[in-house]
Amino acid sequence: MSALVFPFQECVEANLWTASPVRILLLKRTPARGGFWQPVSGRVEARDGTFPAAVRREVLEETGFRLAGPLEDLDWSYAFPGRDGRTWRVHAFAAELPRPSPPTLSDEHTEWAWLPPGEALRTLSLPDNRDALRRLLARQSSRGSGPR
């Protein structure tokens, strides 16, 4: 009997930021994984149960940070064709951290950087990641809080 293959692979993206100073965390993937800069991201696993649970797990796995505060659902998702023939659908979230601490990188990444918002937008490799960050920045700016 073969395994079931669903048409979508659900994924999450976590835009981590600090308010003072205003910084955005970006991670650089290993060359084998594309070598590009992006926020924390990964697949939703069956054990997660919810997108927020997947965000918290991925952040812990990729940075060593335990998210204690609330997550912000950016009400933004995007999709792209995966190499496995499925469509990968990414749901974007954000979380504020108290300060720009050095992450403990997983073996998926080679570098990290806490960048000002404008530099983060220029550094992100993928347009969909830039769109998600722009959404966070616009939302926070309209509230008069958070990264600008």
Spans of features found by a protein language model:
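Short aromatic/basic micro-patch
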Residues: Q38, T87, W114
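Conserved N-terminal beta-strand and adjoining loop/helix that marks the start
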Residues: M1-L25
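Conserved Nudix-box catalytic region and its N-terminal flanking loop in Nudix hydrolases
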Residues: V22-E62
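NUDIX/MutT-family hydrolases
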Residues: P103-L136
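Hydrophobic pocket-lining residues within nucleotide cofactor-binding pockets
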Residues: V44, L67, L97, H109, ...
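Short, well-ordered beta-strand micro-motif
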Residues: L16, A92-E96, W114
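Active-site segment of metal-dependent pyrophosphate-handling enzymes
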Residues: L60, G64-S101
